[in-house]
């Protein structure tokens, strides 16, 4: 029996309730991730690879909200493995925020992860054949304003028994040659991709199989392997592809959509493609015809998946992504270069095999560690504004909103919407 859009929608929404969203502005399949809200606070107080006060130690145990009293580059040798029910709030770091450089991260079985405003840059010294970020199993995760780059296999991939994941407002960039892949998004459990930038990946921008919502993304300078690739024909896929902008770059030699088949069912609407590499943004809408979408089976009814609150036009999506995607509280040198490539509209961009071509991870202002008398993760001056006690560790108490006071403070540091 072929699954209809309405049946797929019912199945996919069984999990989706009116529960508190992960943070104001959380959307999609992963919007209800809980993170470490029912656990304890852990303050990352140094840039060490391991040991007390390190980020690696912070995420090694379940049930933690992780905040930062220091900014800068954390250089790691081995992969970081994240436990269940962990919230990582990179926007709390002083200075220019946090970059983690040198190897990748595993979120396999990291149920209920919430990750915001952090840069994960693997690099050629990372583990061979591994992703910069990967999820092989797990459920209920959301990644917001994450900048991930330089994977040695995929840059950000989701495979296996995975359900209810959102990647939003993020940058997935420069998988290293010779593989150079944006990532696989291959699960029947539901993945939402909203307002992201895929850039300088030879292929898999992304490669999709299963249940997927792909809305208001920008894809720039994919190589000969392909832009948005439809997954294999050995199983059913049911996707929405809405309001995206594809822009050819110097390395682009194939069309935006490839490898469609009769089992890849897609609802498509208002997707733009600028293919001429002339330095001017002048894309046009792809007609709703299977030949424009790599031979996908196009359906007329949109799958009723958890959607964005407001769908942008492709032009507005491009403006949004170039202004705000990635760890954009403070843009580092890498993301600044990547956005400049997009805004060259075909005249700049490169597939790379060595992050040195981008200047490496770069330098970050570490900022000044704020005074936190009770050590509960909220600086004293912020406690005064919140009405909490700077002499009592009360940051994990619940506010009337349902969030912990720690989350309320962290959420106040960044906009919930950029509309």
UniProtKB/Swiss-Prot annotation:
Entry's cofactor comment: Binds 1 Ca(2+) ion per subunit.
Cofactor: Ca(2+)
Keywords from the UniProt entry: Calcium, Carbohydrate metabolism, Cell wall biogenesis/degradation, Glycoprotein, Lyase, Metal-binding, Polysaccharide degradation, Secreted, Signal
Entries under Gene3D superfamilies matching the protein: Single-stranded right-handed beta-helix, Pectin lyase-like
Residues bound to Ca(2+): 274, 276, 278, 280, 285
Stored SUPFAM superfamilies: Pectin lyase-like
GO biological process: cell wall organization; polysaccharide catabolic process
GO CC terms: extracellular region
Active site: 204
EC number: 4.2.2.2
Region (Disordered): 352-395
GO MF annotation terms: metal ion binding; pectate lyase activity
Extent of Low complexity compositional bias: 363-372
Subcellular location: Secreted
Similarity comment: Belongs to the polysaccharide lyase 1 family.
Name of the protein: Probable pectate lyase C
Gene name of this polypeptide: plyC
